[in-house]
Amino acid sequence: MGRATYMAAKPTVVIVVDDNAGFLKSVVRLLSVHGFATRTFSSAEALLDGDAAQTAACLLLDIHLGGISGIELQRRLAGSGSTCPVIFMTAIEDDFTRQEAINAGCVAYLKKPFDPQMLLDAIAKAA
């Protein structure tokens, strides 16, 4: 069975929020190879300062950010009426955090480092 094709006529925009610059660069590279457009933010606060979340097909949020957590970011966006699907990712996993992420509302929860195909599949499900 072949791999799914993710390319669309107009690139799907994925917003990525992570405070690790190297990780952001890797994710942008992966997604661009598969036809996605990306917008990146190094903090939840930076994303909240604008209206970028309104233009995205999905949000890829790190849970453990320097200020507002990815989970709190999702809650704030949902509270302001955003219905943009969320994929949470974290390098520090525990059962409480996983449950909190699920309760906040997400289409996927990925443990870093994750297989690139898992991310692509999660985005296909979300977008």
Tell me what each language-model feature is:
Residues 42-43, 69-72:
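Acidic catalytic/metal-coordinating carboxylates
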